[in-house]
């Protein structure tokens, strides 16, 4: 599996693209504030999911990047609230994007609570030579031995 196959990534990418399209309609004066911020945070959700999955051989890094992704997802929701309050998006769009945002948050939290289902093997990480070799073999082949 590759990170693009992860449901959290797919859903996060989908909402980031929807936000991009919606934000094209924001006023020009918001270009370097709300528009830039909401695009950046929504894209960062996916970037952090990708990084966490690629670095899943390091359990702490996996966890750290997923918590960063969750924080970016919350930031995106905050920007959606501002866009709605400023009347840049209508209520229907706000509700749809909010529901999708919540779903992405749940998927990220599922990954955080179930790291083994995503290939994180914490039993490998004791400081000895055998595990160091195994860790580097996993990185080289991009697969975890069964």
Regions inferred by a protein language model and the residue ranges of each:
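Short, C-terminally biased terminal segments at protein or domain edges
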Residues: 1-48, 55-146
